[in-house]
Amino acid sequence: MVQISEVKGNSRDNRTAAHTHIKGLGLNSQGIAEKQASGFVGQTTAREACGVVVDLIKAHKMAGRGVLLAGGPGTGKTALALAISQELGTKIPFCPITGSEIYSTEVKKTEVLMENFRRAIGLKVRETKEVYEGEVTELTPEEAENPLGGYGKTITTLLIGLKSAKGQKKLRLDPSIYEAIQKERVTVGDVIYIEANTGACKRVGRSDAYATEFDLEAEEYVPIPKGEVHKKKEIVQDVSLHDLDVANARPQGGQDIMSMMGQLMKPKMTEITDKLRSEINKVVSKYIDQGVAELVPGVLFIDEAHMLDVECFTYLNKALESPISPIVVLASNRGMTGIRGAEDLVAAHGIPPDFLSRLLIIPTTAYDPEEIKRIVKIRSTTEGVKITEAAIDKIAEHGVRISLRYCLQLLTPASILAKVNGRNEIDVQDVAECEDLFLDARRSAALLSSEQGQEFIC
């Protein structure tokens, strides 16, 4: 019996996250925000300001500066930062962190900040490779007397003829390449390529002109390469400065048992010294001066920036002034509040005034009922949920009265309740049932403060 097996695809279903519907800032060609575009609704002023920031980043004129997205909870600050990253594309580094991520028992908080700073700075390295590619027409090693004496002879040079579709060349190669050619078992009629920079030689296969030479042969026949024998190829690699730091701080390698055991064990989080970073900066500057590499300042996004303490803000002050620094985008939903680490000092957004004066502040405003209604429609389409107009009005009412997050979280449970009740669409009854099953923050707080809620308190 012939075995037939089904090949299953390896594609995964992507989880619908809170900002899956955001595809960009939704600006037209003049940089003016449309009322509803790319998953965004409202916040036209903030989106236009972020569009200007994106243009400055792409023009490499914003490095070493800071932006603060300030507004209440649920006004789209994280969505704006995500839209900035999507507008920039994959070639410009975008490193998102939260303010509480930097606190660790193993590593200093300033070290974690610097690591993320270096992650947000990219380096575009251009390398030009010279390649000789063609069918071997001649292979002649030139010998000479051994300079050390004796009867033996040594190979001084190797003459090799290569033929391509557009012409042929005769090359005189170093004797070290002869060893590589011997290892590859290259003979006349084989198609090979030789890298001029490294001297690496690779046998591609046998020329298809010799395909009828033998009846039985386990050879791979390839056509003669197109174009000239001598070709130049430009290879562009994108790396971050943190990748270079890690590669030099913890070099991999070693075939002894201790090295192999060290690679298997969980690596301990260690600090990268300032001396190593300064050496890497020197090498990077040298490459930039030579035109081999190009620095690409990216974006470091710090959400919940009020969670940073005084020491972190002092360090950020210094880091922003360094010659190699990214664009720092912070987000905070606090008003006048105490600064962490110096609670007696009250400042706007929980950020010290000296650091706040460095930032361009983009405010976000609360959504009106009509905008919340549109957001509910977009989210229902994204989550694949059918909903009636009356139910949209009811959910939007919760968004105005309670919060946008709470009303959007009701969509999926309401769709499950609608299916249980034998309906394809979410109706007002399903929303009301969800409201009874799931409390919002205000009702929960009111319940705990009442006499009925005393039994919940231990």
Swiss-Prot record:
The lineage of its organism: Eukaryota, Fungi, Dikarya, Ascomycota, Pezizomycotina. InterPro entries: AAA+_ATPase (IPR003593), P-loop_NTPase (IPR027417), RuvB-like (IPR027238), RuvB-like_C (IPR041048), RuvBL1/2_DNA/RNA_bd_dom (IPR042487), TIP49_P-loop (IPR010339). Belongs to the RuvB family. This is RuvB-like helicase 1. It catalyses: ATP + H2O = ADP + phosphate + H(+). It comes from Neurospora crassa (strain ATCC 24698 / 74-OR23-1A / CBS 708.71 / DSM 1257 / FGSC 987). Keywords: Activator, ATP-binding, Chromatin regulator, DNA damage, DNA repair, Helicase, Hydrolase, Nucleotide-binding, Nucleus, Transcription, Transcription regulation. Its EC number is 3.6.4.12. It holds the Pfam family TIP49.
